[in-house]
Amino acid sequence: MRILSSLKTFSQSRLSWLLLLAFVVFFTLCAMYFQHVMLLAPCVMCIYERIAMLGIGVAALIGAIAPQNPVVRWLGFAAWGASSYKGLMLAIEHVNYQFNPSPFATCDLFVTFPAWAPLNQWAPNLFEAYGDCSKVVWQFLTLSMPQWLVVIFAANLLALAIFVVAQLAKTSR
């Protein structure tokens, strides 16, 4: 229980939320390196996964606003969970495009954003897709990029679950 109490206290610090934000910044910079230095063309699914990652960053910013306020902290947890779950579902779908190809299951040709937020027009260097979802263009330790994203988003959900359990556990005084 001491570990859960420590995790609850840590989640009430701004440092914990800024650390989550730092991970998002790191992974986004990795994506930019892959795209602009290694010249790996991002596909539609890559862009959607990138947005899910940025959603985790927004969750971190929400939590960092007032981490000692339970309402703000739980809003941060909810946004973290929603973005991580959506990212995991997108990454799993992307892995299926790569390793279980089907003429009936293909990704879109173009990213689609709401008319009120055409991100690919506002920031094309970050949100424009021109790659093929089914191609494996990069691997590290035998895993493709979407497979790594499955690991990353699943790890986020696991970390979130641990922090939620810590919030609900009774703390000894």
Curated annotation (Swiss-Prot):
Membrane topology of this protein: Multi-pass membrane protein
User: Residues on the Cytoplasmic side?
Assistant: 1-16, 68-74, 167-173
Membrane-traversing stretches: 17-33, 52-67, 75-92, 148-166
Q: Which GO terms describe its molecular function?
A: electron transfer activity; protein-disulfide reductase activity
Question: Which GO CC terms are listed, alphabetically?
Answer: plasma membrane
Q: Keywords for this entry?
A: Cell inner membrane, Cell membrane, Chaperone, Disulfide bond, Electron transport, Membrane, Oxidoreductase, Redox-active center, Transmembrane, Transmembrane helix, Transport
Q: Which cysteines are joined by disulfide bonds?
A: 43-46, 107-133
Do you know which PANTHER family this protein is assigned to? DISULFIDE BOND FORMATION PROTEIN B
What does the record give as the function of this protein? Required for disulfide bond formation in some periplasmic proteins. Acts by oxidizing the DsbA protein.
Which family does the entry's similarity section mention?
Belongs to the DsbB family.
> What is this protein's record name?
Disulfide bond formation protein B
Q: Which organism is it from?
A: Vibrio cholerae serotype O1 (strain ATCC 39315 / El Tor Inaba N16961)
What is the gene name?
A: dsbB
